[in-house]
Structure formats: C-alpha cells, structure tokens
From Swiss-Prot:
UniProt: ATP binding residues: G298, D299, V300, G301, F302, G303, K304, T305
Keyword Chloroplast: yes
GO CC term (a single one): chloroplast
Signal peptide per UniProt: none
Reactions that this protein is recorded to catalyse: ATP + H2O = ADP + phosphate + H(+)
Protein's name according to its UniProt entry: ATP-dependent DNA helicase At3g02060, chloroplastic
Species of origin: Arabidopsis thaliana
The family this protein is said to belong to: Belongs to the helicase family.
Coiled coil regions, renumbered to chain: none
Record localization: Plastid, Chloroplast
C-alpha cells in the first residue's frame, strides 16, 4: 500500500527521501511530517487538499513547464467515468459479496416468476410450462419479402420455401430461400426452424439499414456483439437498481383502524380488480420491509386514483409526507382538488399544490413548509423534483402518467425508488414500465374491469373533411355536450379557431396550450370545466387528467403526428358519463402516412373495448421498438439484430444475470510490480507545501473507490493547476491499482515483452469484457489463460511507458464495468 504509515510500500520510500531533499523550509516540513506520521490510519477528508495554505508567499497557481506536458489521459478517463456513472456510485452504498449473493438470489426468484408469466402469455396459456422460451420463427408463417435474421449469417429477405434435390440424395427436400446482399442462400427447412428469427413484428415492415453479406459475416458478428453488450448494460443497471432497492429497509406501516373509515368514504362500489389493487398496495405497505414499487395499470376512469388516495392516507397518517407527481399543471390541479376534498375531514393533514401559477412569496412559503414537515401531501409537476425542494420525511411518491416525463425527470424518479415507496399510475404504461412489471422486477396490479355504468367510446377513423368535423360537433352540441378539438402543434390553433367561429358563430370557443400565461390557461380550463366554454381547441396539454363529465366528443386532427399512448389518453378524455362518447381521428391522406403510422391507427381501432389500455401498451411496445424499454431511444439497439433475436438475447441475459458478476479485490491486496520512482520538481514541492500529506490523501481516495480518486484528482487540479509529469506518474499508479482492484486483478507484473495480470475473473466474464472493448489494439493483444490475463507487447518497454500502457489497457477494460455487476 502506497503510504507513509508503518510498513510503507518499497516504491514509496525512495520517493520520500527524494521529496525531503527539496528545499521547502526544513523546520516546517519536518514538523508537518512528524505530525502526519502520528495520524496513523485516520482518513483525512478530500477537502484538505484545497484547505492547505502556505505561510510564505507563493505563486497563485502552479504552472508546469511546457516540456513536461503530455496528453492528459487521466482527464479523459475521468470524463468517461463521470459520463458512464454520473453520481450513481455515490448514491449507492457499497455492498459486500455475501450480502449481494442474498439479494441476487431474491431478484432471481422474482425474475423466474415474471419470465414464467411472460412465457405463458406468449404461448397463449394460463400457466407456464417448463419448456425453453424461444422466439425462433416458423418458416411457414413468413411471407415473401419479410426480413429475417439468421443467427450466424445475419439479416436477409425471405423469398420462399421450395423443394430441391440435395447433391447426395435423390429425394427432394424443402428448403428456405433467403436473399442476402451478395447472393441467395438456401437452408434445409429443419435447420431454418432452429436458426431463423423475425427482424420485425408481424405486420411490421421496417427496413433494415443493410442486408448482411454471405461472404463476410464479420460485420454481422460485430453488430450482434454490439447488441449483446448494450443488453448486458441494460440488465446490469436494472439489476443493480433493484439490488439496492431490496437492500433498503423500512418499518412496515401499522394497520390503522381509521383506514377503514377513510375507505368507507369511497362513494362507489369497488370492482373486483379495484379490490385486488387495494389489497396489493395495503400488503406492500403494511406487511413488507422493502419499499413498494408498484404499477397500477387501469383504463381511464377505472379507479386508479382511489388506490393512490388510500396509499397516501396510510403513509401520511403515520407522520410521513407524500408527493404526487403529475406531468402537467392541469392534471396536478385536478389531483389537488380531488385530494383536498377527500382529506377535508382530516384538518391535521395539510395538502399543498406547488405550481407556476403561484407568486414567488407563495412558493417560498410552501418550500419552507415542505422542509419543516408542515405540509403532508405535496402535489405538483416536475418542479417537485428540483434541488430546492427539500422534504422533511418523504415516505411515498405517486407518479401519474410516467410516460409523459422527460429523460432527466425519469432519472430523478428512478433515484427515489431506492429509498421511498413508489406507486405509478398509468392507463398505457410506457414499454419499459410494462416490461418491468411482466418480468417480476416490479409488482403490477391490473384494473381491467370497467365500472357498470361505463359505455365504450365509439371511434371513427377517416381522412379530414370540414363537413365531417362540423357534423360531429353539431351532433354533440345538439345533445347539450361539449367538444375537445385537439391538434399536435400550437401553430394550427388559430386557423381552426377561425374555421369554427365561422361555422358556429353563437357558440363560446376558446384555445388552450402550454405557451399561454398561467392564469389565462387556468381560467380557460376552469370555464370549460364549468360548461361555459362549449368547444375547447387545444394541444395535447389535455392528454391527461381532465375529468369533465359533459364533454363526450373529441376531435383529433393530424393523428399521424401523435404516439399511440397519446392517442389512447386523448380518447380517454371523453366517455366518463353514461352517454355514448365519440372520438374522431382525422388524418390528411393515407398516402402521406408511413406504414408504422397506419399500424398505430389500426391498433387503436382494434382496442375499442373498455379496459384495453394494457393490451394497447403491448402493441405500442412492438410498434415503437424495444429501445424504449430501458431508455429514450425510439429504435434502440433492436435495429442491430432484429426484434426476436434481441428478445432472445435479452431474456438469456436476464436468466443468466449472475454470470455478469465480477468479484473485485481489496485495494490493499493489489500489487503492481514496477520499479518507478518519479522525482517531483522543487517548485511544485514548494507550492504544495506539504506534498506527503497530499500523497497520503490520494492513496486514501484510491483505497476507497474510483469515484473518490477521480474527485481527489479534480480537486487537486482545481486548487493547484495541472500537475507536473512526475506527479502524474504517481497518480497513474494509483489509478492502475484502483482499476485492477475493481476488475478483480490482484497482481500485475512484466516479464520481458509479456505483461501478466493475475485475476479471479472467469473466462466468461473476460470474454464479456473484451467484447465490450472499443479499442482493437488492446482487445487483440489480451489472452486469458488459467487465472491470468496476458498481453505480449512488440518490444520490452521502459518503466514509465510500461505504466502508461497498463493505464490505457486497464482503462479500456474498466470501461466495460457498467456491463457487469461489481460485488
């Protein structure tokens, strides 16, 4: 261990002697050195670097000489770490191997339940069997022109199935003919059944970027590897999040008798699905020690809000706070009104709405009440996730319509999931949410039973004509109702306003969109809710939440510009009363629509029955592409390998997640056998004043973790400027040792042209890591043998160059760690 404590590393001793030979004030330096040595193993804070102050005058900032400058590989590594990890490492406390083993086993059990359920759904059975979960395609189900994926060759176009006589037989056999970029291939039918996958979902016609080549499968192998690595990173990140979630403990909430009184206020008879959802959430809160993460998937108006209200009451009645997060201020205001009314019998429970409608003084007052715990239920939009909102004792997060939040908001929501109970409400869950629910990583309750009085919405899909629009609006107004008229962009609202004012001169018409002044928007929505405005021309700001019983016709223009989930939510704005509701979906001209847009619209027409939001989301998963499962890409890595092979690789990775685990070794057990003793320039020693203490701080940071070492280096450079080359060598050795520890390497040494790394990693993990490497130079030079990773260099390198090689090579290996579980 590189330290000035007893039993110092032999590499450090010459360095100490060399440092002592430089000319800082001798008495001050020796006093500092003695004081530092007495500190034994106490860990000094990183800020000590920036708090050191010299008693003598010194330059305001150290500047290295130009000849010492070198391309800064440490900064490049730090940038990559910050990009890959963000603040995740600091947000998740360390977990030892034994503890990780227990939680991985728990997650595996959950996975098996989820995968069995998925398998049953895919096979159209109620219970899952024990057979293999396969996504391979039946060649007879293919149509000429369909894109297919051969696992070993790549992407081709299916031509057909024909009989042909093989060379060594007189009996004709059935062959599958597939067209590739450089020729035609024929496969025996039995072989094709084992190796062929669909590139697209049925009825989908997305074109791949290129067809594969029969004469060169290396490009296909690279694409497959890229897809596999991307999947590994998805699975590992998911696994780590849930490992840490399982690790969190909280006392179960008490089963308070007043819960029954609160539930009795519900004015309707609960449906069987609702009753089950109530029970599921109650068990999560009162019988489990692990924080809840449950998805309530229910169609519009099926009673999801009541489930949330009961969860909120359970939590806040114990003195904790609840946050209700909505994607728009309109929906947030509606939640606030519903919650305020429901909790009016409990004056000690304070409800607040934080929104842009408030004055600065009102916001400041609310922020203070949240911080001190005087506000029990906080309702609002993404502003609730801001750094200025500090919660006193947050116990529950309710998220409504998660699919409408942006990337950063979703990441913030995810960060809450490791510490508080989370309840997500959605009529059309985003694919990622649905996927987690189906695979057992997340619990889900499905409310698919409509209230007895609900009538299905009648959906009309046709090309746009003004006469049809006028007729639809007139029919609704004649029965005393109101109309939503929705457009995808603000730009077209004025034109529609002019058209409707001309067609209905005596009717009150208004516009609503997100760019309006807050009070103007609020006033418009309030007047529409009161029935004073008969036609509301708007953008999809009304997509979620508006509960207006008298509005039973919605007209959506340019439907091709909306997502399927958006259309389903917009359609759900009507049909909440006992009248038959109508949704008119208008497109400009079918010839202008993409195949995907047409598929989206036909899916919506198919799901006319009530309670089909869950099935619709499954269709949406296929139409939008599975890149959205784990992130925000619309196509994701599915395009590399096709939908079915991507699925198979995903589930294979999920089912073998324990093989993605790497066992790190303690930092102080790592040996770097390289005799290198850099001499620090006297000016730098003078400037640092106490270099020994700073080196000790660097060692302690490296011993803790990579994130701490990175922060130390950045703090050092922020305070003193870029270090000289000799100090960079010292830092690089610390980085090499830290990266080796993370990778499970306990010793690195060189013998002639051969560099050897002794490791505890398995051959499978080594292959996963090298597959992830982007630099061919290092990847091709590494081989795995026994318990060693070896690299043969072209020539024997001088010591400093050898250290640089180790640094670069380990940096490449370390970059693969996000694709591995590090416990």
């Amino acid at each position: 261990m590189m330290s000035l404590l007893p039993n110092p590393d032999p590499i450090t001793v010459p360095l100490v002697l060399k440092l002592c030979s430089f000319p800082p004030p001798r008495r001050l330096f020796s006093l500092r050195l003695r004081r530092f040595t007495r500190k034994s193993s106490s860990l000094l804070p990183l800020v000590a670097v920036s708090s050191l102050s010299a008693t003598a005058a010194k330059p305001t900032r150290w500047r290295e000489k130009p000849e010492l400058a070198e391309s800064d590989s440490i900064s490049l590594l730090n940038e990559r770490i910050r990009r890959d990890l963000g603040k995740r490492e600091t947000a998740r406390p360390a977990m030892d191997s034994e503890e990780a083993e227990k939680y991985i086993h728990m997650v595996k059990e959950q996975q098996e339940r989820g995968l069995q359920k998925l398998k049953g759904i895919r096979q159209g059975t109620k219970a899952a069997g024990d057979g293999a979960f396969s996504y391979k395609v039946d060649p007879y189900s293919l149509l000429s022109g369909d894109y297919v994926v051969h696992k070993k060759v790549g992407i081709g176009r299916f031509v057909g199935i024909k009989f042909d006589v093989p060379k060594d037989s007189s009996e004709p056999l059935e062959y599958v003919f597939i067209e590739y970029a450089d020729g035609m291939a024929k496969l025996p039918l039995k072989q094709a059944s084992r190796l062929l996958y669909r590139y697209n979902l049925p009825n989908e016609t997305k074109r791949p970027r290129t067809l594969s080549r029969l004469s060169d499968t290396s490009v296909w192998e690279r694409r497959k590897t890229k897809g596999k690595v991307a999947i590994q990173k998805m699975v590992v990140d998911l696994m780590e999040l849930y490992l840490h979630r399982l690790r969190q403990k909280r006392y179960p909430y008490p089963k308070n008798p007043i819960m029954a009184d609160f539930a009795a206020q519900f004015p309707y008879n609960a449906t069987p699905d609702q009753k089950q959802a109530f029970l599921d959430v109650e068990k999560d809160l009162t019988e489990r020690e692990t924080p809840m993460d449950r998805l309530i998937c229910g169609d519009v108006g099926f009673g999801k809000t009541e489930v949330a209200l009961r969860a909120i009451f359970c939590v806040v009645s114990t003195g904790k706070q609840a946050m209700v997060l909505a994607p728009t201020i309109v929906l947030a205001k509606q939640h606030y009104d519903v919650i305020s009314e429901r909790f009016s019998l409990y004056p000690h429970i304070k409800v607040g709405l934080l929104s842009r409608f408030q004055t600065k003084a009102e916001k400041e007052e609310y922020l203070e009440m949240i911080k001190t715990g005087h506000l029990n239920i906080i309702v609002g939009t993404h502003s609730l996730l801001g750094s200025r909102v500090v919660y006193s004792n947050l116990g529950l997060l309710v998220v409504d319509e998660e699919q409408r939040f942006g990337v950063k908001q979703k990441e913030k929501i995810a960060s809450f999931k490791t510490s508080v109970d989370v309840l997500t409400l959605s009529a059309t869950p985003i694919p990622r949410t649905l996927y987690l629910a189906l695979t057992g990583f997340r619990d889900a309750s499905l409310i698919s039973t409509p209230p007895p009085e609900r009538i299905p919405i009648k959906t009309h899909l046709s090309s746009f004509r003004k006469e049809k629009v006028i007729e639809a609006i007139k029919n609704e107004l004649d029965r005393g109702g109101q109309v939503f008229y929705v457009l995808p962009r603000i730009k077209g609202l004025e034109e529609v306003m002019d058209f409707l004012e001309e067609a209905f001169p005596d009717i009150d018409i208004a516009m609503a969109h997100g760019k309006q002044y807050s009070k103007q928007l609020e006033e418009t929505m309030e007047r529409f809710a009161q029935g004073k405005i008969k036609i509301l021309i708007c953008t999809n700001i009304v997509e979620s939440g508006l509960d207006i019983q008298n509005a039973n016709t919605i007209i959506i223009q340019d439907v091709q510009q909306f997502g399927l989930a958006q259309l389903y939510q917009l359609r759900g704005r009507v049909g909440r009363a006992d009248k038959e509701a109508h949704a008119y979906l208008f497109y400009p001209d079918k010839s202008l629509l993409s195949d995907q847009a047409l598929e989206r619209l036909s899916a919506l027409e198919e799901c006319r029955e009530l309670g089909q939001g869950f099935q619709l989301a499954e269709k949406d998963m296929g139409i939008r592409g599975f890149g959205t499962i784990f992130g925000e890409q619309q196509t994701g890595d599915v395009g590399n390998v096709g939908i079915d092979l991507f699925f198979e690789m995903l589930f294979e990775s999920l089912s073998k997640v324990e093989e993605l685990r790497i066992f790190s070794v303690p930092y102080d057990l790592v040996k770097i056998d390289i005799n290198i003793n850099p001499r620090l320039p006297s000016e730098y020693v003078n400037y640092l004043e106490n270099p020994m203490e700073i080196i000790h701080e660097a060692e302690k940071a490296a011993e803790k973790d990579m994130w701490s070492l990175m922060q130390f280096t950045e703090n050092l450079r922020r305070q003193y400027g870029k270090e000289p080359y000799s100090m960079e060598i010292i830092l690089k050795k610390l980085y090499v040792r830290r990266m080796a520890a993370d990778l499970g390497v306990n010793r690195i040494y060189a013998s002639g042209k051969m560099v050897v790394m002794k490791t505890n990693m398995s051959k499978k993990v080594f292959k996963l890591i090298t597959d992830s490497m982007t630099c061919d130079v290092y990847r091709s030079s590494l081989i795995y043998e026994g318990d060693q990773i070896m690299a043969e260099l072209l020539l024997e390198l001088p010591r400093e160059q050898l250290l640089n090689w180790m640094f670069q090579c380990l940096s490449e290996l370390h970059a693969s760690l996000p694709a591995l579980i590090k416990y």
